[in-house]
Amino acid sequence: MAPRPRPGQLMLDEIREQPLVLERLWREEGAAVRALARRLRARRPPAVVLAARGTSDNAALYGRYLIETRLGIPVSLAAPSVVTLYGARVRWRGMVAIGLSQSGRSPDIVRFIEATRDAGALTVAITNSPRAPLARAADEVLVLHAGRERSVAATKTYTAQLTMLSLLVAHTAEDRRLIRAHEALPDAVASALETVPAVTDAAAHLSQASECLVTSRGYNFATALEAALKLKESSRMVAEALSSADLLHGPIAVVERDFPVIVVAPRGRALGHLSGVLRRLLRRRARTVVLSSVPRLLASAAVPVRLPDVQEEALSPHVYIVPLQLLAYHTARLRGLDPDRPQGLRKVTYVL
């Protein structure tokens, strides 16, 4: 009988596995992604709807930003209850509906994809389980090839979902620069794994706090949401994610001396705004953890987490989430918790 893993070992192993997962996805599913991209270009859908829950819902939000900015197609994030609770018949004909679920067994997502397919949408499943109900419900299936994810906290399937979405959009847009930029992702994610000394410093501060804020903007708003979710799941911390734009519309009032705020600030269109938000947080004496490659931002942080420059801003979420996954792990361990077995959680949640 194999020995029981140490607390959190499954989560840590799966975080470390991510560079190999992204390489395998590119290799195994590239042809399927290109074929679906051709079908999407031919279809020219007037809109896309993305259906997901939990971590997958954060990946879906990233997909919304990417599809709207790179393809110019309006995107809706699904409210599955419209179908499963209210039985509404929505006019989906001609549109594209994408369901994201690592297990492929979330009943409300499966039912939503079935309803959109029956209403005339082209349906796509993005899942780690090619034989799951979601895959059977969809017209097209993209498989994550992430291997079994044993920890309750999803890590490697999240970055795989981000990569699947960015590859699909890059090929649909026939954006050669964005396509080529994916080749550097495994190495960039491997570099992000080397942030452990800074991350453990941040965890030492967070483990003593009862709450924190996580903020970013644009593509990395999804990163902030996923980081907050991981801290809640693994560390039992009241972590709230806010767009840095929304943070200024009132919530910044809760920030006082030594209040922990995590700022995700890669180079890109949102950097100027995030720099201004960081200055305001510093004036309020917040204890800031800053993830960036920009020296002047890192120099102002209580805990700087230096990351490599990412060639394409649109791919920075794939890299910037990695130290935040590590942060959730280390914070949980410092609190004496097992992030592989969060209290009251299961790997698959059944909601209809």
Question: What are the residue ranges of the model-derived segments?
Answer:
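Generic C-terminus detector
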Residues: 4, 311-352
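Active-site phosphate/pyrophosphate-binding segments
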Residues: 6-10, 14-45, 49, 140-260, ...
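Glycine-rich phosphate-binding loops that contact phosphosugars or nucleotide phosphates
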Residues: 41-187, 217, 252, 264-310, ...
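Hydrophobic membrane-spanning alpha-helices of multi-pass integral membrane proteins
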Residues: 259-267, 320-321
